Amino acid sequence: MQFSKMHGLGNDFMVVDAVTQNVFFSPELIRRLSDRHLGVGFDQLLVVEPPYDPELDFHYRIFNADGSEVSQCGNGARCFARFVRLKGLTNKRDIRVSTANGRMVLSVTEDELVRVNMGEPNFEPAQVPFRANKAEKTYIMRAAEQTILCGVVSMGNPHCVIQVDNVDTAAVETLGPVLESHERFPERANIGFMQVVRREHIRLRVYERGAGETRACGSGACAAVAVGIQQGLLAEEVRVELPGGRLDIAWKGPGHPLYMTGPAAHIYDGFIHL
């Protein structure tokens, strides 16, 4: 099987063309491939499939390193767009794809950044999903013998965003896994730790569902900005500084889609016998 290794701000992916190759990935195989000592090593596996709808260009599938399939990955979306152009699967700059729970438009700019229409953030608890009686801008949760204030949103996947004074000292390693699997998140969640530098600039670390802390989380950056705007903390255009680098997020508020712009890098191509 041929594959490419790519990364978006250090969030790394194994990307496989299932348009011209016949492939099947069991959870066991994905876990084996994701092993950084015995396999290829990656945070997520991205699979390019033929479109299910003739109006679209491709179907986009995402698997975490633990073998679970998820419906959204923002950094992966940027790598997906670069991959299909690099491999000659399309020459379009605006690429329309379906995911497990919707559609996306991936736009490759002249300087090879990728702008992704991530859709409108969804704050309805049932849609996240999150167990709550009604939608709130801020929720109170108990975890690890602490009372935690957080915002909750779906960007096509569930996110919990906590504001912290300093991301460098935030309890990502201890609070992250506890909140990820908290009983109020029936499908688990990605946990963002957000430091507001100013209205146009945040710092962020994300403990990702099924992957642990990563160098960058695109949908996590989108979620943090969406929650920050909803809570009145942030402007409509925000620079997000992650351990792996910078993303630019823009959202005009309810009724509008949120846009993420950032880089995607090709590392190498490989072949592996399965």
From Swiss-Prot:
Its EC number is 5.1.1.7. The record marks 268 as: Important for dimerization. Belongs to the diaminopimelate epimerase family. This is Diaminopimelate epimerase. The gene is dapF. InterPro entries: DAP_epimerase_AS, DAP_epimerase_DapF. It catalyses: (2S,6S)-2,6-diaminopimelate = meso-2,6-diaminopimelate. The keyword Isomerase applies. Catalyzes the stereoinversion of LL-2,6-diaminopimelate (L,L-DAP) to meso-diaminopimelate (meso-DAP), a precursor of L-lysine and an essential component of the bacterial peptidoglycan. Homodimer. Its main location: cytoplasm. Substrate binds at residues 11, 44, 64, 74-75, 157, 190, 208-209, 218-219. Keywords: Amino-acid biosynthesis, Cytoplasm, Isomerase, Lysine biosynthesis.
